[in-house]
């Protein structure tokens, strides 16, 4: 029985990426373009020993929604509450990577500490690097407002600005804004669980936006 136990543990080690690169945000920092590039280059990445898992779409949002237990789509327009199946399937894909797995979703920046711990434990890899792309908040705000308009908020720009800036950290109209954009707090949570040596911030150069590619 001890032999079988050792064999099962060995198989678990074999079914694991040697390294995982995680692009965790932030929102409105060119993430969609980056993810489109990853998706378009997945065959080339594979030849280089990097696996970019597929879960529907060019990014890994559905897997992260599954981890978070969030509703995929608009709640009042037929959105579906995610169960953990997508996340479990995604983890299997990551662990099957022969060398390096690449994970990308800006919704990772919204994880609670408990969810970050689960993310880390489920992936089960000792070599994980977390990358965040960052732009000045002043550049993010107009783009964030446009995004919120797409999902149905009715407030005009001035009213919305007051809702997020009168009391930074609190937003009565779009609560997710500060969950996503209290950048220092988000970074602190990831540093706490992965170590500062494993969390990298890349500041987007507005004059040379293509440098990220």
Model-identified regions with their sequence ranges:
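Conserved small/polar residues in nucleotide/adenosyl-binding loops
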Residues: 1
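PAPS-dependent sulfotransferase catalytic core
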Residues: 4-7, 11-101, 105-107, 137, ...
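Short, function-defining helix-loop hinge/capping sites that tune catalysis or transport
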Residues: 38-39, 57, 112-114, 144
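PAPS-dependent sulfotransferase catalytic domain
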Residues: 44-46, 113-213
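The substrate-binding groove and active-site-proximal loops of carbohydrate-active enzymes
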Residues: 106-109, 175
């Amino acid at each position: 029985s001890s032999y079988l136990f050792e064999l099962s543990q060995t198989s678990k080690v074999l079914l694991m990426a040697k390294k995982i690169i995680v692009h965790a945000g932030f929102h409105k920092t060119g993430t969609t373009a980056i993810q489109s590039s990853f998706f378009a280059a997945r065959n080339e990445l594979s030849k280089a020993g990097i696996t970019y898992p597929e879960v529907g779409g060019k990014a890994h949002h559905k897997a992260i929604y599954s981890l978070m237990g969030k509703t995929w789509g608009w709640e009042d327009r037929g959105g579906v509450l995610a169960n953990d199946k997508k996340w479990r399937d995604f983890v299997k894909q990551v662990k099957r990577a022969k060398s390096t797995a690449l994970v990308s979703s800006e919704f990772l920046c919204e994880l609670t500490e408990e969810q970050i711990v689960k993310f880390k434990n489920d992936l089960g890899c000792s070599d994980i690097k977390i990358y965040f792309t960052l732009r000045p908040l002043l550049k993010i705000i107009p783009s964030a407002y446009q995004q919120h308009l797409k999902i149905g908020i009715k407030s005009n720009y001035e009213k919305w600005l007051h809702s997020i800036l009168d009391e930074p950290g609190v937003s009565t109209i779009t609560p997710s804004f500060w969950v996503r954009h209290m950048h220092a707090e988000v970074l602190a949570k990831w540093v706490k669980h992965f170590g500062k040596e494993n969390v990298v911030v890349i500041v987007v150069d507005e004059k040379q936006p293509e440098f990220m590619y």
